[in-house]
């Protein structure tokens, strides 16, 4: 029987950098933008990047994407159940 090969999803050039925010960072993010956590865009817990990070529903991810004009920009996603 074939075994499943491990693949580092973050090694792929098209996958942006992801990280889980701490509770303190999440509070600061919500305060800075004057929003509720429910107003953040969502990402499913089954997303390959979420699974690779080990994030769980309720966690907030910071995603760093490349930009031709700004260099990098950050966006945030709330991990939700499927």
From Swiss-Prot:
Protein name: DNA-directed RNA polymerase subunit Rpo5
Family annotation (Gene3D superfamilies): RPB5-like RNA polymerase subunit (3.90.940.20)
Species this protein is from: Thermococcus celer
Single annotated GO MF: DNA binding
Quaternary organization: Part of the RNA polymerase complex.
Catalyzed reactions per annotation: RNA(n) + a ribonucleoside 5'-triphosphate = RNA(n+1) + diphosphate
Main location: cytoplasm
Gene name for this UniProt entry: rpo5
PROSITE patterns: RNA_POL_H_23KD
Superkingdom in the source lineage: Archaea
Pfam families, sorted: RNA_pol_Rpb5_C (PF01191)
Described function: DNA-dependent RNA polymerase (RNAP) catalyzes the transcription of DNA into RNA using the four ribonucleoside triphosphates as substrates.
Oxidoreductase recorded as keyword: no
GO-annotated biological processes: transcription by RNA polymerase II; transcription elongation by RNA polymerase I; tRNA transcription by RNA polymerase III
Subcellular localization: Cytoplasm
UniProt keywords, alphabetically: Cytoplasm, DNA-directed RNA polymerase, Nucleotidyltransferase, Transcription, Transferase
EC class: transferase
Record-listed E.C. numbers: 2.7.7.6
Family stated for the protein in its record: Belongs to the archaeal Rpo5/eukaryotic RPB5 RNA polymerase subunit family.
A single GO cellular-component term on record: DNA-directed RNA polymerase complex
